[in-house]
Amino acid sequence: MRDRVTFCIKTIHRPHCCANLVRSIYEHCGDDRPLIYVLDDGKPELRFSQVCPDEAAMVDRLIETEYDIGLSAGRNRLVEAAQTRVVIFSDDDHVVGPQTRLNDLVRKFESSRLDLLATLSKQPHRPNPDGTPRLLNSSGGVLHIPRGEYRRIGDIAECAFVCNCFVAYRDILQAIRWDEDLKVDEHWDFFWRAKIAGVRVGVAMDHVFPHIHVDPPAYKRHRPVFLRAALRKHGLRKVLWK
């Protein structure tokens, strides 16, 4: 896959999580693994390269920026840095596991009609996975994000909103981009704009990224601040997940 796919990881203050993800790519993909690019905007003492130097040496490119450029800016820089037609994204507290079947996921994506294909995300202590397909609709100043899908083709559910573990065409991500002003409340904004632009999205229901959640130490997300900014941007009053 190294000639056509780049696995992009944005990380801050979770070096051991990032190390687990990098090792899992090697373990489950072997020599047929994608290129691995990591962008780290953490404080110097919590950098991936400082805390986990062995795993940092395993990546193909490590980009270290000034402190806290934000999730959105980090993802945009990774997309700009990658040279392959296809990129994979997942949060740094996920890993590739037996049910991820990353190589099969990429092949399935490349043979589909989609621009972005996500997987499910599963925390070990929860009975059901996250990331099931959702739709996006706006009415009366409210953005609704209910569970649902447009159609099912094989194990792929075509929809409008998915989780943060996905494979996509790089030029599509370059065209939509994540809003850097929204930092950590970027997700629904990205997929709302993607829907308006006609991006074709789906979930491969037979593929799962294990999710080992860890809160980053010494980092405040300030998510309510960015949620208010996102609502103002779209002229909305609230978001309902139903």
Task: List PLM regions with ranges.
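Short, well-formed alpha-helical segments that are part of the catalytic scaffolds
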Residues: 14-28
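Acidic donor-binding segment of Leloir-type glycosyltransferases
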Residues: 25-64
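Glycine-rich, basic loop-to-helix element that forms the pyrophosphate-binding segment
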Residues: 66-82
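Short aromatic/hydrophobic "clamp" motif used to bind/position activated sugar donors
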Residues: 87
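Conserved donor NDP-sugar-binding/catalytic core segment of glycosyltransferases
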Residues: 100-136
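A recurrent flexible, glycine/aromatic-enriched loop bordering the glycosyltransferase active site
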Residues: 147-168
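Acidic donor-binding loop at a coil-to-helix junction in glycosyltransferase catalytic cores
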Residues: 184-190
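Active-site donor/metal-binding and catalytic loop motifs
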Residues: 204-222
